[in-house]
């Protein structure tokens, strides 16, 4: 159980920390300046996308795709909910302070960036033939075409 869910929880924590760091940076350095707040928010989203991309590439090489998709869904979903519901409280705001529109827009951006990053990561690894299933088929093909071992006679 620990081996399965520890990496998923770690992914959720890392994504949440990146989001909170972006919120704190926006609060400290861009309080009141919309352009700077937007720029810092986009940088935080880009870092989230990079983390999801790297995690997807790492996991797809070692695990079956359905398991990777499930783990990513739980990790990213948990991080998204924590970032949207808990993150604002850590910088002195409230989740619905600027209305429901911004609240749901944050969710869609977060999930959209994560889905695109995961899709790109999976697509690249599968195209290169480095995913778990391609490697299994490669081993099978090598084993099936190999000459049988000769039995040593005594």
Question: Where do the language-model regions lie?
Answer:
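C-terminal halves and exits of single transmembrane alpha-helices
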Residues: 74-98
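N-terminal signal-anchor transmembrane alpha-helix
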Residues: 1-48
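Hydrophobic faces of alpha-helical transmembrane segments in multi-pass integral membrane proteins
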Residues: 10-18, 44-48, 73-78, 82, ...
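Membrane-interfacial segments
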Residues: 25-34, 60-64, 89-94, 98, ...
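Alpha-helical membrane-inserting segments
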Residues: 18-26, 52-56, 81-90, 120-128
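Alpha-helical membrane-associated segments of multi-pass integral membrane proteins
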Residues: 92-139
């Amino acid at each position: 159980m620990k081996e399965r869910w520890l990496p998923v929880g770690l992914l959720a924590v890392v994504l949440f920390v990146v989001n909170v760091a972006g919120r704190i940076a926006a609060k400290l350095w861009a309080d009141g300046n919309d352009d700077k707040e937007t720029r810092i928010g986009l940088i935080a989203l880009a870092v989230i996308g990079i983390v999801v991309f790297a995690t997807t590439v790492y996991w797809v090489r070692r695990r079956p795709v359905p398991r990777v998709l499930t783990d990513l869904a739980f990790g990213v979903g948990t991080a998204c909910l924590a970032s949207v519901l808990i993150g604002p409280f850590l910088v002195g705001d409230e989740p619905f302070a600027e209305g429901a529109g911004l609240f749901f827009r944050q969710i869609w951006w977060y999930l959209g960036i994560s889905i695109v990053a995961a899709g790109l990561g999976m697509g690249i690894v599968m195209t290169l033939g480095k995913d778990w299933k391609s490697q299994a088929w490669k081993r099978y093909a090598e084993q099936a075409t190999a000459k049988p071992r000769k039995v040593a006679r005594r």
